[in-house]
């Protein structure tokens, strides 16, 4: 069982993060620590000049009035009193490929995890309204499990996974 910090840049109540949370929670301990509002395009920016408010929404769900990277840092350093095994950012509404990764808050949140020496995975789907988000979430879980169970070091790396808008059919 992994302890997973799940974040994104689309907001804690976005459909895709909720779906991934449900699927990952079937076999793992998962906490959503994600932006209060949509923060797409924030890259790995941090809120060093602003006070950041954290709101507990549910037992394992926190909304952060800050950037996606703020969510990773706060989740890993102060919100909980244990260590996570991995940081997962996504599932992003829209692909993060090519130059998009330079601006992506989804990738930025994963970079925050990497900067604190945690294995990070960013996940995106090439659609703002995926045909079958349950299928994408299930495939994401399979990949996350394989990467984590491989015991290969992700030190200094960010895994960036992009799915086409596909369904199980």
What are these regions (language model features)?
Residues 6-13, 100-101:
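Short, glycine-rich nucleotide/cofactor-binding loops
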């Amino acid at each position: 069982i992994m302890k997973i910090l799940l974040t994104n840049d689309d907001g804690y109540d976005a459909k895709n993060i909720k779906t991934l949370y449900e699927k990952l929670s079937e076999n793992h301990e998962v906490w959503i620590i994600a932006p209060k509002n949509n923060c797409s395009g924030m890259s790995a920016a941090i809120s060093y000049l602003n006070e950041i408010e954290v709101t507990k929404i549910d037992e394992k769900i926190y909304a952060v009035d800050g950037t996606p990277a703020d969510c990773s840092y706060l989740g890993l350093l102060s919100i909980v009193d244990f260590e996570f095994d991995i940081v997962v950012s996504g599932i992003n509404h829209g692909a993060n490929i090519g130059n998009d990764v330079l601006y992506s808050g989804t990738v930025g949140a994963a970079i925050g995890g990497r900067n604190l020496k945690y294995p990070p995975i960013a996940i995106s789907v090439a659609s703002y309204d995926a045909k079958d988000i349950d299928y994408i979430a299930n495939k994401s879980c399979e990949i996350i499990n394989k990467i984590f169970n491989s015991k290969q070091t992700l030190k200094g790396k960010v895994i960036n996974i992009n799915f086409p808008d596909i369904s199980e059919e």
